[in-house]
């Protein structure tokens, strides 16, 4: 998949504000601060397309980006961040859960997992949620360049054991660009 154009389309704080469109949606989900916005920026070649922050919980809305005028990339709020009010966590969970379970336009969910922490319970719960709702999903291991070779092997084994239905697993480094072409090739299969 070659990305020729990528533009911000809209942000939604509620499900009723989602775009009325038949364009396929490729959704990016993961724990807070896993690198969703950074990945979107490196995939599209636009440094400031999605706002990034070192502060977990920066993305608080469902953010839509139009890609090549033929599909959306959707950046969801991160899950698992404890330093926000309980009510805010509940609202994020309701928004994220409602979107994934109800949105017909979703063609693929890309689950980002921090390769340094591949066995987090919240990531396992997300995989179970995606499988329950029969959503096709792939896994992107972020921050992969920070692992030693021995750790890389352990991470891939761990993931294969609890994500049997994943369409793909891609190692990704925003710094080196490792995994970018592989991920774009995978995404091409879900563009409609």
From Swiss-Prot:
GO biological process: division septum assembly
Gene3D superfamilies, per database record: P-loop containing nucleotide triphosphate hydrolases
Pfam families reported in the protein's UniProt record: MMR_HSR1
InterPro entries referenced in this protein's UniProt entry, alphabetically: G_ENGB_dom, GTP-bd, GTP-bd_ribosome_bio_YsxC, P-loop_NTPase, Small_GTP-bd
Binding-site positions, Mg(2+): 37, 59
GO MF assignments: GTP binding; metal ion binding
NCBIfam families: GTPase_YsxC (TIGR03598), small_GTP (TIGR00231)
Protein name (database record): Probable GTP-binding protein EngB
Organism of provenance: Prosthecochloris aestuarii (strain DSM 271 / SK 413)
């Amino acid at each position: 998949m070659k990305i020729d154009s990528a533009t911000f389309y809209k942000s939604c704080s509620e499900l009723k504000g989602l775009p009325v469109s038949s364009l396929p949606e490729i959704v990016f989900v993961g724990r807070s601060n896993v690198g969703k916005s950074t990945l979107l920026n490196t995939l599209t070649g636009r440094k400031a397309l999605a706002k990034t922050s070192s502060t977990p919980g920066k993305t608080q809305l469902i953010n839509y980006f139009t890609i090549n005028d033929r599909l959306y990339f959707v950046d969801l709020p991160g899950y698992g961040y404890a330093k926000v009010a309980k009510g805010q966590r509940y609202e994020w969970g309701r928004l994220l859960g409602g979107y994934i379970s109800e949105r017909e336009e979703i063609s693929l969910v890309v689950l980002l997992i921090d390769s340094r922490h591949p066995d987090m319970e919240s990531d396992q719960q997300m995989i179970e949620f995606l499988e329950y709702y029969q959503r096709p999903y792939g896994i992107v291991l972020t921050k992969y360049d920070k692992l030693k070779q021995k750790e890389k092997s352990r991470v891939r084994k761990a993931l294969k054991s609890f994500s049997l239905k994943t369409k793909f697993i891609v190692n990704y480094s925003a710094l080196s660009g490792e995994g970018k072409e592989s991920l774009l090739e995978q995404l091409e299969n879900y563009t409609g």
